[in-house]
């Protein structure tokens, strides 16, 4: 019986059983599975028969690794599922997935085995005879150290690189550079470019490529400067009625049109969507092969929420460039209907990671033809823990694609994501990469208690003017529903919007808010990203968010494209850990800081220092004293 992982419970072989098998996929299904364990393994391409071959029983541990580490890494890197079933002298290996990934996993396993066999042949026979056999005739207290063979990682890496080359060898080349600088743009002096960027929200650009830096393209201040070679796109822009590009669009377009990967860091409402969509249209229509020959979508836009996905799809439909077809894929809609829509042929897929990953794993969508990738609102993606799904999705997207990433903030986690998925990118950001709330918004901070929140909110609502439109942020769904009910009972028009709301109810609430039928929209952060609301006068933070990035994003709903407005934020003792960060944000935006907030921040700092001293003075192993009072 197998003995490579002693920390798992062993099972005796039963002639009636199919055999013990190692069956791991990510963090689920790990451990032993027999005939009553995992039924019907699933993986990408699981409709295809598994790739089966045999290995010697003494090589099973080499493939599994300590605590299953190697087999888990293999499955993660190849997007496959691997089963190993013990036999009398040989173990049967079954690999589930698509054809390329199965071959890649088999090649990696064979490399591991060759490396181990080479190591064994070089080992001394005397040394081998003197060692206690692992897993045999051991007492309960026996401890045996197993020599870890030297890994020939260069050979493994070379095998993986070769497999990757074979995987993408049949795909046509990608054309990326379509930019021709206009005469007006080329005539801009260096000082004019510097002044333009400073006057337009202090836009900053940088080249993140290592080594010799490239020249940052000059901004295209007019639509015709960016798209003079594409009259059909200019006609669509004129038809929609946009007068001039936003600053972020002016700077992003010449970079993307040159085929350079780009990171855009800017708040919601700065025109990020069109900054990547319009170059994407040109990219799709200008590839060496026709759309019919492409055999799949050419552009993929990943968004964290269905609201943002619907907004992006609406923008695609609005400009309708050369008949490009787009589809929106997200959870909550009919899955079979989405599969049917994809099968009819699409050029652009706008999707949330969860639903797209589901369709990908069941071979319902072909992503090999994607040459233009957008990761929209990357910071929100990470907040919602979508990174594992993103990694799996990108296993099936060609590595020589062009990639654009947008984010409202620039924390270390987003930087790491950018390093993983973008190649030699440039970055364009508004203002400073440190968190800064827009200075066109008057930020009012009220230090209060949980009990006083309702009364303060009621007072605020009663003092609203007829033209005011308020987004009210809360932390929980039931609070949104309770507040909405209370306001409507009083004859105050309000709607709640959260993750449990039906899609039709969400769309109706947003439309009612835009049209002015309701004046107060009460929402949670999870659905707020992607809401296309341009005439908000007030943001009311009933509950303070979990991190300061979200606060900046909330306030940004008012300050879109330089508009002015007011935010009101209630902060209580339970939010005291955020007080110091909030003060920094207020200082950077030249806002007044309430004395109560300063006191809260100082008190929290003192409490933390006291707790730290107590922890350091405590003896090792000594627990903090607990006191219990009996009534």
Curated annotation (Swiss-Prot):
Any Gene Ontology CC annotation: intracellular membrane-bounded organelle
Q: Does the keyword Nucleus apply?
A: yes
Name the PROSITE patterns on file: DEAD_ATP_HELICASE, HELICASE_ATP_BIND_1, HELICASE_CTER, KH_TYPE_1, Q_MOTIF
Gene Ontology MF annotations: ATP binding; ATP hydrolysis activity; mRNA binding; RNA helicase activity
Domain named Helicase ATP-binding is located at 253-428
Matching Pfam families, A to Z? DEAD, Helicase_C, KH_1
Q: Which UniProt keywords are given for this protein, alphabetically ordered?
A: ATP-binding, Helicase, Hydrolase, Nucleotide-binding, Nucleus, RNA-binding
Give the main EC class.
hydrolase
Which cellular compartments is it found in?
Answer: Nucleus
Mind telling me what this protein is named?
Probable ATP-dependent RNA helicase DDX53
Q: From which source organism is this entry?
A: Homo sapiens (Human)
* Gene name as annotated: DDX53
